[in-house]
From Swiss-Prot:
Pfam families with a match to the protein in the record: Radical_SAM
UniProt-recorded name of the protein: Lipoyl synthase
Phylogenetic lineage: Bacteria, Pseudomonadati, Pseudomonadota, Gammaproteobacteria, Alteromonadales
Top EC class of this enzyme: transferase
EC number: 2.8.1.8
Amino acid sequence: MNRPERLQPGVKLRDADKVARIPVKVVPSERETMLRKPDWLRVKLPSSNQRILEIKAALRKNGLHSVCEEASCPNLAECFNHGTATFMILGAICTRRCPFCDVAHGRPLKADADEPKKLAQTIKDMKLKYVVITSVDRDDLRDGGAQHFADCIREIRLLNPEIKIETLVPDFRGRIDAALDILATEPPDVFNHNLETAPAHYRKARPGANYQWSLDLLKRFKERHPTIPTKSGLMMGLGETNEEIAEVLRDLRAHNVEMLTLGQYLQPSKFHLPVERYVPPAEFDELKALADELGFTHAACGPLVRSSYHADLQAQGKEVK
């Protein structure tokens, strides 16, 4: 048997190369078998792309990344046009191979020690009042990247004292307590970690992750910081049932999670997991009603909702669909 080729630092693997060695093999989708996208998922493009170009230029100038671009988010045009972006720190190469995600896999480069200062200056230049900071998984780092998160939060607040910061963190696999110790030095205003799907679908959708670990991460952060809102997000359309999603909502509340996002999974390419169904808006409304009944302080549920979509409005408790 031939040994797998050693990954070269900084080389991005995408599509078939990315998912080649995951436990549940993804069969490339044929065009004729792919579900037709319904009208409710059509995204309206802004009349002008000037603001979009400005934000992209600001990111390129400082060598920064946005998850909006790296993960091919359908809301990129709307968010960029409104002057908001979700910044992705620690590079654009992930150590995991999740087959629903369009972020590249590979062997990441060393973290950029200047990134926290560059990020803070970019946010100041863009005059942002609310930012979301996320990252790729960095299983190659002893602390999973927690110190880099803390450094970014500190530098952002030094230059932008009035800003609100939401972190969308990885699962810090095997190092939760160490990561939370570090984050306690610079806690965010909102702590977000996505469960993504129901536990029965983790093996195919989140290889390398663990449902209970993710719940424990959210719960342990809340135990340390009872006044800081915790948040999680889920996708629909990966083969789960509505009852499975309902059970996840109950688990989240049992672990003291207060904010929820629930949206439709969209297949980035034919090499990613297929969309098994497009969930009608009425079903999102039903799950929103359940979330309210369970006691979530805010639940954004709709086909185009993403974990950082209008995150500032979500944090204010305003309706987002």
